[in-house]
Amino acid sequence: MDTTQSNGQTDTQGQLHAQTAEGGNDFGRRNPLEIGVQLRNLVNRGDFLTVQYAGGQLVTRLLEVDVRGRTFTFDWGALSDQNRGLLGAPRCQFHAQPDGVRVEFATATPRETRFEGLPAFEADFPEVLFYVQRREYFRVDAPILDPYVCSGRLPEGDTFRFEVHDLSLGGVGMRTADERVAELPMGTRLLDCELVLGALGRLSLDLQLVSHRSTALPNGTQRYQLGFRFLTLPGSAENTLQRLITQLEMKRRSLVR
């Protein structure tokens, strides 16, 4: 997996406990069965997670969940230094953002194991798993007919044009059959992207890749779904997106009545 270095470690539980105290809502899952369900959802969807530890971080995927044993297995990193660092870390923080929901939890030191003949990590269930769906993560599907599009340049300078799948105040989901995205590392930043939103006009925004999935179509081609978060969202852009999200949600509700 692709890795990046970090000088510190986020106190995830402290941040989310503070949010709980302020908002009056407890986002924590403490029942091992509930924790197992959330971890299995990450396995089934193939979502990427970022694991932060003292001195670094790596991007991984969950491979298997053992609810009875209260353990889970996750993918080995690409760099031996990161793997050694993680095996020696007293505490590991996991972060994921599947479908606009923030999933975060912490574990003690993981162990080296094998999964399908290959090296992997195994860790005990966390004591608490935070599952947070906040206002900025509420997503609505974009129109299929006359779809919205996002265009810009990939890190190498090549242009792209992807179809918008869904929207929130926190980011945008896109889909494409463009094979160039298969090798985009997590955390990739795409700057000055143009989001074309039909009658509401255009927005110029900086994006960062936070999720990446591929699906094989019946004809054998791959379809890629990409999730990006907005690095910054100016007030005018937020107002435009909020109006659009409200309109799309009202239209959706009118169709299901």
From Swiss-Prot:
Monomer. Interacts with the flagellar basal bodies. Acts as a flagellar brake, regulating swimming and swarming in a bis-(3'-5') cyclic diguanylic acid (c-di-GMP)-dependent manner. Binds 1 c-di-GMP dimer per subunit. Increasing levels of c-di-GMP lead to decreased motility. It holds the Pfam family PilZ. It is found in: Bacterial flagellum basal body. Residues 1-18 have a biased composition (Polar residues). The gene is ycgR1. InterPro entries: PilZ_domain, Split_barrel_FMN-bd, T3SS_YcgR, T3SS_YcgR_PilZN. The lineage of its organism: Bacteria, Pseudomonadati, Pseudomonadota, Betaproteobacteria, Burkholderiales. Gene3D superfamilies: Electron Transport, Fmn-binding Protein, Chain A, predicted glycosyltransferase like domains. This is Flagellar brake protein YcgR 1. Residues 133-246 form the PilZ domain.
